[in-house]
């Protein structure tokens, strides 16, 4: 890969991870490098052969362009992301093209009375008649207690997910199984919780 930088620009070409996600578990905004949170053996997230251009107009805002070409043009991914900070929250807005779909989304990260509050959502508009539209959204709350206990609660909605999942759906959660961002998880409604304590 190659990279060029100046005071307000970074341009990188080659294998890289373009990380547009905010949440810990599910990242609807991450259209370039989706991953499986439950693949515990995979230590490093995958990358894309892509062009990434970042522009920093000021210390609160970032504008990004990403393009990952594919051998079949229709399977390429391209997008534009704008990040800013307002009211002590980080916000982002994106629009792009994902494998024969147009997509638009938003994300945020902040806190409510000391409780971390994050979220992401994307909508997909098919360009082919046989394609399906879809909305995916995830939100999460996390908190670190004064005695060292960390707790997190996260919810995901996937419009293309199974409302009544069977064994086949669970099989797609195994190692090396990565869902795309349009159909991010096998189920329509998913709740995830975890807790950790530092000894």
PLM features: what roles do these ranges have?
Residues 1-62:
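Outer membrane beta-barrel
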Residues 41-44, 62-78, 179-189:
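Glycine-rich phosphate-binding "P-loop"
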Residues 109-199:
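Detector for outer-membrane/organellar transmembrane beta-barrel domains
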